[in-house]
Amino acid sequence: MRINPTTSGPGVSTLEEKNLGRIAQIIGPVLDVAFPPGKMPNIYNALVVKGRDTVGQQINVTCEVQQLLGNNRVRAVAMSATDGLMRGMEVIDTGAPLSVPVGGATLGRIFNVLGEPVDNLGPVDTRTTSPIHRSAPAFIQLDTKLSIFETGIKVVDLLAPYRRGGKIGLFGGAGVGKTVLIMELINNIAKAHGGVSVFGGVGERTREGNDLYMEMKESGVINEQNIAESKVALVHGQMNEPPGARMRVGLTALTMAEYFRDVNEQDVLLFIDNIFRFVQAGSEVSALLGRMPSAVGYQPTLSTEMGSLQERITSTKEGSITSIQAVYVPADDLTDPAPATTFAHLDATTVLSRGLAAKGIYPAVDPLDSTSTMLQPRIVGEEHYEIAQRVKQTSQRYKELQDIIAILGLDELSEEDRLTVARARKIERFLSQPFFVAEVFTGSPGKYVGLAETIRGFQLILSGELDGLPEQAFYLVGNIDEATAKAMNLEVESKLKK
């Protein structure tokens, strides 16, 4: 941790002796800079270009050194637009990696990749800053306690429970509900959770970042009257930013979370939306740096880049980081190198299915594809484990019978299979749930369902006690009592129609 009382801005430390170079070449967001012999900057050092463009506008671009080319030249990637830069412009080597403000001063504020506030609420205290590049905690510092993290979402808590201090991935293609699910988790966990949260918006829509900020202000997670009382820091590098910014914004958010864990010894929640964009930005930068592409056009350093980010997201004896990451799945192909590399680092995976989304079942979590290392009898208890396995078995049997049903119809099934299908359809609908953050779209109030209630509900469906109820009674309800009440209402309505 570096404390620098004299900083010229969040991203850069002031140096007594400036090491100056000049721009030799500009290719989009990539700059080649020539330095005097023996004065070469280190890899990952921050370089700053200051000056004026041809119209007289002030320019202030920060870059990060990526390659040493030889002949006293380095290749750097810009963290903001390179418009107005020209060959021959002066470049200052700051002598250190990008550093961002950390600690209580970051709470309630929105930052860019350089740690500069972008919310028009004035400057941030930059006395305590930390470099965004650092090594992961040593083995001896890691903590291995196992406990469940309750989310209030039935399908998650029952079938793929999250680990406190673990890494969780939300996998899905375009438009199946990853961002809504991550917003709901922020709503359910960040409000109930006593510690602080850090949200990293990596290469996603600016509108969603704005909606999230407004929502947090409304819910009190960000306290407008007293910013210091806020519970969350937001870091955004959106879709319209250069690849350098999108590639590093995840590290900026992580650095802020690490400070709360290591120095303040707090339990931190880290939300990243979307980790695929981190890989995508790395792929763009890799091509710009002239590296040979690997499988499916991704960068050859894909595993290394992902590992260096993911290994820092961990729980130590000082505090924990529980991270929830949305992972875009290109063309719904889970074997694509980007999601496949991410899988290896996670404790729980929540896979969103387009088929369920098409049926209108939200959250569209696939009960058979989603997995968790926590679903073991010694961790969750025998009853929870048993119910979860029976729910999966029933769903799997229904999946196997779907072809027969499509060709021959339900009447050709045996009595036992017909009962299985009826229960599986009730389970499928009962796994849906109204969300708090979707209230504005659906008009139905959100529901938080405790784990004990969830287990009781599925126990009743599997035991056959609710076989007489219509399946639509289980759709978009909270606990099982709401389903029975809805069934009675449906019965009354149908009698009135007659």
Curated annotation (Swiss-Prot):
PANTHER family linked: ATP SYNTHASE, ATP SYNTHASE SUBUNIT BETA, MITOCHONDRIAL
The name this protein goes by in its record: ATP synthase subunit beta, chloroplastic
Source species of the chain: Calycanthus floridus var. glaucus
Function noted in UniProt: Produces ATP from ADP in the presence of a proton gradient across the membrane. The catalytic sites are hosted primarily by the beta subunits.
This protein's encoding gene: atpB
GO biological process: proton motive force-driven mitochondrial ATP synthesis
Recorded family membership: Belongs to the ATPase alpha/beta chains family.
Superkingdom: Eukaryota
Binding site residues for ATP: 172-179
Localization annotation: Plastid, Chloroplast thylakoid membrane
GO CC terms, sorted: chloroplast thylakoid membrane; mitochondrion; proton-transporting ATP synthase complex
